Amino acid sequence: MPIQVLPPQLANQIAAGEVVERPASVVKELVENSLDAGATRIDIDIERGGAKLIRIRDNGSGIGKDELTLALARHATSKIATLDDLEAIVSMGFRGEALASISSVSRLTLTSRTAEQSEAWQAYAEGRDMAVTVKPAAHPVGTTLEVLDLFYNTPARRKFMRTEKTEFTHIDEVVRRIALARFDVAITLHHNGKLMRQYRAAPDKNQYERRLGSICGATFLQHALAVSWQHGDLTIHGWVADPVGAKQLPDMQYCYVNQRMMRDRLINHAIRQAYQDQLSDEQQPAYVLYLEIDPHQVDVNVHPAKQEVRFHQARLVHDFIYQAVMSVLQQASAPRLDMTEPETGKPVQWQQENRPAAGENHFAQPPRTTNSPSYSGKAPRTGQARESANSGYQPENPYQKKQDELYKALLQPTDNGASTPPSGIAAPSTVLHDSCPNRTATNTAASNNKQRALVESPLESQSTGFGRVLTVYPPCYALLEYHKGLAILSLPVAERYLKVVQLTPSEEGLRAQPLLIPQRLTLSKSELNVLSTHHTLLTRFGIDVFVESQRATLRAVPLPLRQQNLQNLISELIGYLADYQTVETQQVEPDALASWMATRLQSEQENWSHSQAIQLLADVERLCPQLAKTPPSELLYMMDIHDAIKALKHE
């Protein structure tokens, strides 16, 4: 048979073999076109599982009359024009194959109208050469696509279609995934004239959980942990189910990259690894996660159905997702403090905190604008997803809006710098008074005066923190309101002390975090001997180095070392351990090794922001309380404010 150019219809049918797998594929391609057109409402009508009819109607920008013929042509698109556009795709579609492929295996009709046109136009392709016919029609601004008799001219493909129920189930799943990706778009789904799904638009973030609950169910919502992390151009947000909820939701895995639904193995591996031993091998995590990344750093043109992507910095993306999910799960599983009085069993009244903005572990994330804390120790009974960073005690009674207002008022500093409990919330000392009702009136009055004095003028001995961060003096010094005075604190020194504590192993040792790509280490024979000699010590520090036949492979490191230059750090570590081997009577102490590594770690910050300083000091107060009580001179310096005051006095 001689070489010849295939007819357009046959070429399109071959292309349809990859694009149009089943009716659900048609729905996906057409709905994504509607989203690219800026539609805010999409109506989907299905008959007989999509075999008889698929109709997609939207209120997008529409297609002009002059472009209708090109819309049904192969490799014709308005999404990209140059190779540079292909390397930074921001639209759902970009190949220009969908409509041509679908029209070659069905009877497709395209009706559209733009806002500039006074009437709509309808186009359809037919014949061996796929000639396009255009005629006037009645239609509002937007586009309607009708796909009739799918695979009518390809009997082999039609034979492999499943039952009507099965095909509609696949369509329903596609619509669910799209509805989770675009909360701002209203979507309705009809099957055989019956309304099956109606997803109302949720333009406000406060309404996201309503759609999340309608798609994922109440079980997922009750076990959901909110995720919100940022690092450079990488942002991840969404929800993951705690291990208990994940065991009940085996098929709840939704992941999106720049609002594009994905089934990417790298992302799935990072999330699965974050759960680690909390799920068995046959169990799957449950999550709805949204990854935002610079379009130049991801290639979406690597899969026929665009269900997989290729990241230019795969290791960075993997570690970022892993750290975000793992931190949320660790915070949720952290032990809770007993917040009840031992005698009465009643919840302790709200008490003053030393820092309103204490403690969320951001991955170089700018501060949030939300000021309302939430308390969610276990799955909320109200059906609202928990905020992972604020997991704590949840009273038996549901958390009320009034309590939220009272608590926020408690955190607001007064003019004299002290926080006064609002009405309805007892001060810390009033709990003792309430538990001892049999007092005389005189004793009660004296006690109240003493309590008032304690609230208005807290003793210095009661201060267990660094005080309030007033500002940050560039690049790395924090000005503090400390012990009724002003103090300068070195943030790099505080960070070093914190890393020493984080790197000091407990009895169980530090948890090893597996690397996405194990690193081969080029070492001499003597260096390999050092690794073998101190293998137990390194394992206790969470450093997993596999030595075999004169080769070494670094497979895991503890969390504080993940972002370091591991090749250089391990080389310096071997030299440090080798120095100890030269003196036979000395052994490496874990505390000394932790201090040494902390001095070698590169700081993640060069120019500190106010929120980062608050976060660091909150972590230091929590993990190194002794530093706040008796700070060393290299960490904190008290300023003499009296000289400045004298300079302002004019006799």
From Swiss-Prot:
Role, per record: This protein is involved in the repair of mismatches in DNA. It is required for dam-dependent methyl-directed DNA mismatch repair. May act as a 'molecular matchmaker', a protein that promotes the formation of a stable complex between two or more DNA-binding proteins in an ATP-dependent manner without itself being part of a final effector complex.
InterPro entries, per the entry: DNA_mismatch_repair_CS (IPR014762), DNA_mismatch_repair_MutL (IPR020667), DNA_mismatch_S5_2-like (IPR013507), HATPase_C_sf (IPR036890), MutL/Mlh/PMS (IPR002099), MutL/Mlh/Pms-like (IPR038973), MutL_C (IPR014790), MutL_C_dimsub (IPR042120)
Annotated GO MF terms: ATP binding; ATP hydrolysis activity; ATP-dependent DNA damage sensor activity; mismatched DNA binding
NCBIfam families named among the record's database cross-references: mutl, PRK00095.1-1
Family indicated by similarity: Belongs to the DNA mismatch repair MutL/HexB family.
A single Gene Ontology CC term: mismatch repair complex
Region of interest (Disordered), ranges: 336-398
HAMAP family: DNA_mis_repair (MF_00149)
SMART domains found in the cross-reference section: DNA_mis_repair (SM01340), MutL_C (SM00853)
Gene Ontology annotations of biological process type: mismatch repair
UniProt keyword list: DNA damage, DNA repair
PANTHER family cross-referenced by the UniProt entry: DNA MISMATCH REPAIR PROTEIN MLH, PMS, MUTL (PTHR10073), DNA MISMATCH REPAIR PROTEIN MLH1 (PTHR10073:SF12)
Organism: Pectobacterium atrosepticum (strain SCRI 1043 / ATCC BAA-672)
Name of the protein in its database record: DNA mismatch repair protein MutL
Biased composition (Polar residues): 385-394
